[in-house]
């Protein structure tokens, strides 16, 4: 019987079955190795991705804990920078205020200069006008009781001119002037004063 088993030929179907059974066994280790490599590579990639993030997190959050002195220093530095910025802004605002303040005195000085010049011109005009009226009062015959304003002085000057015109047109004065070379200024002044008091100037002014 042993000889029959050993000597019995193996059928091709049995060979194919045995080969098919051996092939999965052979293929399993490589797949297991590849799976292990993939798992390792995925773990490495995950570890690498978490590593920088963890390092960054450790550098930011882990390294500077809320109660750590490093974070306190950084907080002070950031506060100092913020204060410096605000101080710089305040300085800029102060500079703007100084520039505007520098412009306002100049405009005030210009206005003050214009006012002074206007006052000087007004004084000169008033002085020249007073001098002209003083000269006119010397020519016009006035009474001792006269305290004439500028308008009254001008009206009196107009009346005196009218009186002189009437004197020149008078026939009686023409006959008197034929015998006299001239009529004294005092007489004209007296005649004009009488003429004023009698109100003859109002009658002549109405003509």
Swiss-Prot record:
Location of region: Sufficient for transactivation activity: 166-196
Record keyword NAD present: no
GO CC terms, sorted: nucleus
Subunit and interaction comment: Efficient DNA binding requires dimerization with another bHLH protein. Homodimer or heterodimer with E proteins such as TCF3. ID1 binds preferentially to TCF3 but does not interact efficiently with TWIST1 so ID1 levels control the amount of TCF3 available to dimerize with TWIST and thus determine the type of dimer formed.
Entry protein name: Twist-related protein 1
Record's compositionally biased regions (Basic residues): 34-43
Species of provenance: Cebus capucinus
Biased composition (Low complexity): 1-18
PROSITE patterns referenced in this protein's UniProt entry, alphabetically: BHLH
């Amino acid at each position: 019987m042993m000889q029959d088993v050993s000597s019995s030929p193996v059928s091709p179907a049995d060979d194919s079955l045995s080969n098919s059974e051996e092939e999965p066994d052979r293929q399993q280790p490589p797949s297991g190795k590849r799976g292990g490599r993939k798992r390792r590579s995925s773990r490495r990639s995950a570890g690498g991705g978490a590593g920088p993030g963890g390092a960054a997190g450790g550098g930011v959050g882990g390294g500077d804990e809320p109660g750590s002195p490093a974070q306190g220093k950084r907080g002070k530095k950031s506060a100092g920078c913020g204060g410096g910025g605000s101080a710089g802004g305040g300085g800029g605002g102060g500079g703007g205020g100084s520039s505007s303040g520098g412009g306002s005195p100049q405009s005030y000085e210009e206005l003050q200069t214009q006012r002074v010049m206007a006052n000087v011109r007004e004084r000169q005009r008033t002085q020249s006008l007073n001098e002209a009226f003083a000269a006119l009062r010397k020519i016009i015959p006035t009474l001792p009781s006269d305290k004439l304003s500028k308008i009254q002085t001008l009206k009196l000057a107009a009346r005196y001119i009218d009186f002189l015109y009437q004197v020149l047109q008078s026939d009686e004065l023409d006959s008197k002037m034929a015998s006299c070379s001239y009529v004294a200024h005092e007489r004209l002044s007296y005649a004009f004063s009488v003429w004023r008091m009698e109100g003859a100037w109002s009658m002549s002014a109405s003509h």
